């Protein structure tokens, strides 16, 4: 038979369908189609060409079949991906008991391995049969068993059992089990087996060391010391110059960041290939050594055949150039030209992807778009590179549109694509689209790994969906550092979830999570908002323990925390240690701390120090300082800071401009605020809101509403919740009841803004000031949320102004206030005022007794004026001022002139059941009257407006007296109390007596 059909001819048919058919015809012609050996070769030849039908026909027509016949048909079908048919052959083979030698077992087990998890059922049965036939101890067969158990079901235990049954283990046996432990990430067991291998006398091969190197690199942070030990062992074995081993070591050292060792191995290698080059280049790029990676490529380009992957890595090096981004971009364009010339860009999708990625990272998004557009073939990486590049370059809308286009092309998004798309949605605050992407990913069965889940948490946190953020975090099987930072940061940004943020931080600690500066910054932000000073100190201690207390980000967060908790000594200690690390955030935090703790002199000293030492104040710092001066109505200091902002060329900045509008309106210079507002080149919501609130605060409700209409017509800035607080306040101060309800209803009807508690408070004030107490009571009962302290205090104040009418409603409001704020003296004073206004002196005595029993002290009322020589402060009946005699003399003169003009003291505001004469005397010495008398006595010939600030609300008698004084003296008086501004001129007030 062999003379008719030479063996060499039989072997030449493998892989050639035509030759196989010719061979088949020769068998028929020579009547050799029943020969088992030749038929087995024919089956193998057909299967090698993928012709399973012809192979099956030959197999079925064989009168006799041996184990090789079955092995050929099973392994061939499995190799061609026809696993179900291979499974059927396996069953038939087992039934017929065709197992004549160990080589048949090898073929069958490999087929089981290729079939996968289904084939493992038969693999186990065959394993059992091997025990009966004593083949389980054979190294060749058991080596395949080890591989099958690991690749099919990932079972280290079964693989180890198969390894243990081998009587005489060869190097393949040892390499197989070491490879299993390496892939399983069990570093200790892999090296324990390696030690046993050496003890057994087996010589390690290049594959042994390859697995060990892989094991050392499988850790999250590769063990450099372990790699060094492996390298020493490899040197002793003489395999360091081996191409496979050397390339693996270079890649391993490069991945671990130990580039000195990577270069050392690279230089010692006798031969190198593209894999070796790529491994070292990847390490250089990871360390952001773009120039070195480029130089290495240029040096090796003429010595080895570089692969297309080498060009992809080279392109990734250009964005990492340390000198200038433009240099890297220029080099990238040169390589782009080279790959076009060589034609690589036309048939290598990877190079096109590398070009898109390179241009995007170098900031040339237009070039990235161009490359992407002209790519004939695009895979998921192409789309991901483009979407990620758009997101990183701030083209968020286009990134989202590219994602939609990608889905229209039926390309499934990968993890990186989802992360970039969700990031763009978060930047755009497009929660709905983000939810759609989330839902589609779940529907498609895409694995939402830790990184994607983190991106989802960021999206929901940025768009205010805190509950969704919590759900994502809870559903994650594992959390990394970013996960904890995301949830803690999201909770810390929500006022209602601040305690939860602290609890979450503690849980992260208990879970053994490594904490970084972002974690500490977030939790310190929550602690500072809660004013938990002691907890802040404990977290400071943890930061020291974690060796990150000296990082600028952490120190800035600590300064902000200590400042808000009133621990300025702690702030100053940290600030003094940061001499070389201070940035704008540091200075801002320190100044804000001083301002928060009412240390305005120190805040201003720090500002002047910054200016003298050449520090540049940014817009937010100016805004912070201006806001502080606005809160205490220090006009002169505010104007000084304004001058500094002009010198710094920041006057036109929208943040500074808005702060200036707010400062001038709060300091009584509404004319300056309006003038500056009108000259602003750009306005944001803060600008409009400050001006509208300024009008409302100064009693110019009509002007506030006109400006609101202008804002709507402008169309650039939609009204927000703060805008409507100003609008409703304007209606309240101007007594515009119908207008108030119209704007209140328009919030939800026209702008989709759900009214908040502060808006309900404004409406309660509108009704209260209009004297509509019955409607006010009905309004409160129908509120969708429980009234808070501000609303009940508004109700009580309205009852005070009603001269005792609806006293029961006022009493109810007072009782609610005593429950909510039992230690606030204002609540007791308001109740007393209500009883006094109605002449209910016995109830007034009871209210004062209740206040005394609660050990609550009333805040002293005081007024102050700013003169050239400083600030002068006055309290009621005070005679400690150096010019007290002059002041009281002037006051008597004013009282006489006012009486002559028709002034009658409103003794109801004396709040005591005293004789009429005593009440009048008490009213005469209120702090604001002392202040105005002082200014009039000190500035006899001046015609400038008199500006007086008061910490409490002005009483009705002083309000009446100031109208008379303004007319008698011919001076405008501007009084700012705790509620609003009053402009007195020619016997009238800007509030039209509606206050």
Curated annotation (Swiss-Prot):
PROSITE patterns: PPR (PS51375). Residues 791-868 are annotated as: Type E motif. GO terms for molecular function: RNA binding; zinc ion binding. Keywords: Repeat. Residues 900-995 are annotated as: Type DYW motif. Residues 869-899 are annotated as: Type E(+) motif. One of its GO terms (biological process) is RNA modification. The keyword Repeat applies. PPR repeats lie at residues 35-65, 66-100, 101-137, 138-169, 170-204, 205-241, 242-276, 278-303, 307-342, 348-378, 379-413, 414-448, 449-483, 484-515, 516-550, 551-581, 583-617, 618-652, 653-683, 684-718, 720-750, 756-786. Pfam families: DYW_deaminase, E_motif, Eplus_motif, PPR, PPR_2. The keyword rRNA-binding does not apply. PANTHER family: OS07G0578800 PROTEIN-RELATED, PENTATRICOPEPTIDE REPEAT-CONTAINING PROTEIN-RELATED. Belongs to the PPR family. PCMP-H subfamily. This is Putative pentatricopeptide repeat-containing protein At5g09950. It comes from Arabidopsis thaliana. The lineage of its organism: Eukaryota, Viridiplantae, Streptophyta, Embryophyta, Tracheophyta. The gene is PCMP-H35.
């Amino acid at each position: 038979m062999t003379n008719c059909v030479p063996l060499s001819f039989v072997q030449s048919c493998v892989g050639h369908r035509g030759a196989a058919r010719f061979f088949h015809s020769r068998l028929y012609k020579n009547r050799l189609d029943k020969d088992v050996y030749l038929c087995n070769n024919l089956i193998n030849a057909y299967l090698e060409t993928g012709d399973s039908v012809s192979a099956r026909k030959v197999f079925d027509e064989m009168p006799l079949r041996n184990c090789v016949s079955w092995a050929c048909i099973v392994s061939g079908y499995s190799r061609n991906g026809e696993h179900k048919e291979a499974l059927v052959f396996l069953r038939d083979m087992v039934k017929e008991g065709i197992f004549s030698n160990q080589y048949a077992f090898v073929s069958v087990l490999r087929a089981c391995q290729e079939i996968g998890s289904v084939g493992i059922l038969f693999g186990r049965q065959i394993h059992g049969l091997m025990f009966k036939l004593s083949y389980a101890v054979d190294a060749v067969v058991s080596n395949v068993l080890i591989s099958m158990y690991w690749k099919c079901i990932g079972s280290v235990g079964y693989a180890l059992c198969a390894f243990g049954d081998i009587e005489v283990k060869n190097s393949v046996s040892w390499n197989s089990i070491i490879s299993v432990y390496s892939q399983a990430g069990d570093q200790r067991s892999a090296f324990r087996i390696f030690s046993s291998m050496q003890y057994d006398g087996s010589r390690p091969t290049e594959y042994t060391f390859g697995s060990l190197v892989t094991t050392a690199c499988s850790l999250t942070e590769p063990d450099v010391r372990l790699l060094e030990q492996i390298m020493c062992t490899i040197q002793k074995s003489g395999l360091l110059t081996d191409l496979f081993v050397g390339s693996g070591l270079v890649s391993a050292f490069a991945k671990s960041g130990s580039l000195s060792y990577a270069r050392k191995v690279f230089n010692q290698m006798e031969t190198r290939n593209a894999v070796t080059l790529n491994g070292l280049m990847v390490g250089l790029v990871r360390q952001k050594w773009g120039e070195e990676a480029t130089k290495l490529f240029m040096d090796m380009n003429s010595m080895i055949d570089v692969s297309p992957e080498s060009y992809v890595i080279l392109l990734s090096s250009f964005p990492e150039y340390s000198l200038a981004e433009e240099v890297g971009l220029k080099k990238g364009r040169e390589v782009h030209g080279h790959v076009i010339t060589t034609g690589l860009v036309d048939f290598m999708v990877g190079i096109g992807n590398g070009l898109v990625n390179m241009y995007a990272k170098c900031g040339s998004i237009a070039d990235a778009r161009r490359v992407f557009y002209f790519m004939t073939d695009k895979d998921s990486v192409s789309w991901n590179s483009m979407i990620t590049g758009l997101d990183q370059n701030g083209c968020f809308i286009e990134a989202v549109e590219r994602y939609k286009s990608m889905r229209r092309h039926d390309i499934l998004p990968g993890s990186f694509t989802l992360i970039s798309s969700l990031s763009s949605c978060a930047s755009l605050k497009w929660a709905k689209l983000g939810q759609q992407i989330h839902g589609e990913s779940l529907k498609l069965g895409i694995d939402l790994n830790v990184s994607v889940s983190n991106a989802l948490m960021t999206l929901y946190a940025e768009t205010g969906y805190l509950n969704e953020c919590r759900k994502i975090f809870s559903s994650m099987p594992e959390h990394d550092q970013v996960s904890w930072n995301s949830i803690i940061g999201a909770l810390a940004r929500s006022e209602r979830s601040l305690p939860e943020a602290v609890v979450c931080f503690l849980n992260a600690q208990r879970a053994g999570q490594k904490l970084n500066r972002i974690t500490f910054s977030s939790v310190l932000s929550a602690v500072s908002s809660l004013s938990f000073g002691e907890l802040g100190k404990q977290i400071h201690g943890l930061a020291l323990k974690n060796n990150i207390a000296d990082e600028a980000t952490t120190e800035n967060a600590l300064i902000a925390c200590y400042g808000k908790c009133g621990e300025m000594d702690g702030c100053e200690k940290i600030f003094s240690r940061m001499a070389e690390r201070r940035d704008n955030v540091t200075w801002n935090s320190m100044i804000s701390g001083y301002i928060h703790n009412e240390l305005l002199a120190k805040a201003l000293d720090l500002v002047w120090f910054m200016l003298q030492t050449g520090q540049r104040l940014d817009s937010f710092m100016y805004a912070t300082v201006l806001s502080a001066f606005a809160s205490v109505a220090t006009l002169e200091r505010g104007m000084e800071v304004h001058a500094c902002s002009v010198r710094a060329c920041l006057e036109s900045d929208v943040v500074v401009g808005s702060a200036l509008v707010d400062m001038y309106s709060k300091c009584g210079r509404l004319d300056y605020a309006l003038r500056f507002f009108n000259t602003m080149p750009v306005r944001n919501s803060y600008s409009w809101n400050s001006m509208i609130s300024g009008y409302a605060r100064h009693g110019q409700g009509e002007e506030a509403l006109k400006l609101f209409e202008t804002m709507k017509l402008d169309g650039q800035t939609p009204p927000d919740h703060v805008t409507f607080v100003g609008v409703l306040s304007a209606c309240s101060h101007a007594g515009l009841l119908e207008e108030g309800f119209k704007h209140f209803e328009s919030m939800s009807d026209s702008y989709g803004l759900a009214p908040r508690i502060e808006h309900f408070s404004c409406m309660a004030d509108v009704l209260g000031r209009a004297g509509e107490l019955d409607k006010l009571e009905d309004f409160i009962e129908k509120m969708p949320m429980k009234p808070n302290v501000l609303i009940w205090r508004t109700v009580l104040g309205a009852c005070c102004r009603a001269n005792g009418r609806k006293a029961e409603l006022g009493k109810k409001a007072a009782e609610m206030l005593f429950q909510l704020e039992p230690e606030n003296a204002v609540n007791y004073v308001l109740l007393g005022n209500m009883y006094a206004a109605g002449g209910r002196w016995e109830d007034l005595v009871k209210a004062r007794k209740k206040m005394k029993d609660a050990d609550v002290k009333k805040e002293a009322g005081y007024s102050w004026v700013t003169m050239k020589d400083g600030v002068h402060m006055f309290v009621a009946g005070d005679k400690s001022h150096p010019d007290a005699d002059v002041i009281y003399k002037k006051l008597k003169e004013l009282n006489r002139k006012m009486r002559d003009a028709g002034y009658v003291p409103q003794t109801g505001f004396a709040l005591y059941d005293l004789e009429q004469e005593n009440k009048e005397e008490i009213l005469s010495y209120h702090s604001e009257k002392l202040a105005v008398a002082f200014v009039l006595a000190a500035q006899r010939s001046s015609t400038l407006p008199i500006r007086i600030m008061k910490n409490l609300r002005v009483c009705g008698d002083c309000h009446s007296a100031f109208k008379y004084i303004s007319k008698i003296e011919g001076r405008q008086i501007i009084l700012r109390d705790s509620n609003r501004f009053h402009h007195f001129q020619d016997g009238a007030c800007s509030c039209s007596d509606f206050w």
